[in-house]
Amino acid sequence: MRLALVQTPCKLGDKLENMRRMERMLDQADADVYLFSELFLTGYMCRDRHPLLAEPVDGKSVTRVQGMAEQRDCSIVFGMPTASDVYTGVVHNSAVAVSPDGTIQRYDKLVPANFGPFEERLYFTHGLSPVLFTLAGMKVGVVICYDLFFPEFLREYAVQGADLLVCISASPATSREQFERIFPARAAENTCYMAYANQVGAQLNMVFFGGSQAYGPRGDLLARCKYYEEDIAVVEVYQREVALARRMRPTLRDTIACATPSEAGQEKS
């Protein structure tokens, strides 16, 4: 899989302009899968406008992205506020993946951030479970920003057979050091590729650092976009490298073994 990490500034609340920017970035690199940031469609700092900007996953914006994916024979993953198709008024902070055949996959952020400058729980309802995507023939586990700090979510994906872990994010400059400590650990402990696509630029009083990056299944840095600038980076993701890493350090095998009940050490009643 050729995976493109894309970071370009969003225009707050302007979905049409952000889709134009998406299309422009798609033409700057050749890839099988393009990864855009959290809430790319609207920008992150829309606050109480998110419920007004939210769309169902079969709405106009996703339909337009389907056309881009079909035309370029690629998959596109991006963040947007989605309106629940079950409960009126419920809005999720979602990652949406559109494949070239028109297939739509969706993951809703499990832990909306609600501390410091973040007030996501005022506007978004949390998701219910991890969702394993299939993209370009690979199994891909998706999380959104703060979800990354809950290693059990990513381990669940790895146990389910994920080759690649993806985090789309809107991480400000003050969070950079924490995020960059975690990426190689998540890759190495799960023996998966780890890819991160961040917002970049200023929105209201928040500055996003960019620095989208990817790691191999042993935790080695493969590529990193520029900090604080529009940029795109392309990495190659190989299933054989995942298989080799898991043979050399079988943490997933032993995780599954540890989770299996055993009579050893049990007291008899």
Where are these regions (language model features)?
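CN hydrolase (nitrilase-like) catalytic-core segments centered on the catalytic cysteine
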Residues: 57-77, 149-230
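Active-site catalytic loop in hydrolytic enzyme cores
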Residues: 86-160, 172-181, 244-251
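C-terminal beta-strand edge segments of enzyme domains
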Residues: 106, 132, 199-269
